[in-house]
Amino acid sequence: MSNFKQKVLTAAVDRYVLTPTQCMMLRQDAEVIGMKRAPVLAKDGVTRTVSRTRTCTSCWIPFAPHYKWLYGIINELTEQINAEHYRFDVTGVQQLQILRYSPLQKFRWHWDCYTSEAPVRKLTAVVNLSAPNEYLGGGLQVKADIENVRFIREQGAGCWFPSYVEHRARAPIWGTRWVLVAWLTGPAWR
């Protein structure tokens, strides 16, 4: 008999997801790819880029050989964290996204799973690409118990949580906050 207890309302933090050098490289790559107003899926099911809910900029990291290492890190850590905390049926990852929050830019309280059709977003991962001294205020806030919460603002640290847990990105009042976001998917919930 296993002593496993599923932690469906817990967020897990890994403080060593990416190195500072990798974080800076991804930020530079995002600038080259091109940052645009981040889209948001509205309640009516339409994707919009003009919204008071989400005011940051974003770019997508392609599934390309150049980023195989990054997708590998996310998949490997997700496998470990999922086995330890959730044991969700995760079978893939959506295209990664880099977000840039300039002063007063935010993403209000929201969930990352909007459909019951497969593939369903099951886990969300947010990795800090900025050092804590590069911005004031702002940051990820999750409506869940967070293990190792004291590390959540460190550059290269990542936070995993179920995609159905409400969360938000608070606006920095000074500086710029960069993050990498991953959505891990799987078949419909049973």
Per-range role (PLM):
Residues 61, 68-190:
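Catalytic core of non-heme Fe(II) oxygenases with the double-stranded beta-helix
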Residues 2-85:
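Non-heme Fe(II)/2-oxoglutarate
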Residues 1, 41-42, 46-48, 94, ...:
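A general, composition-driven signal for non-globular sequence regions
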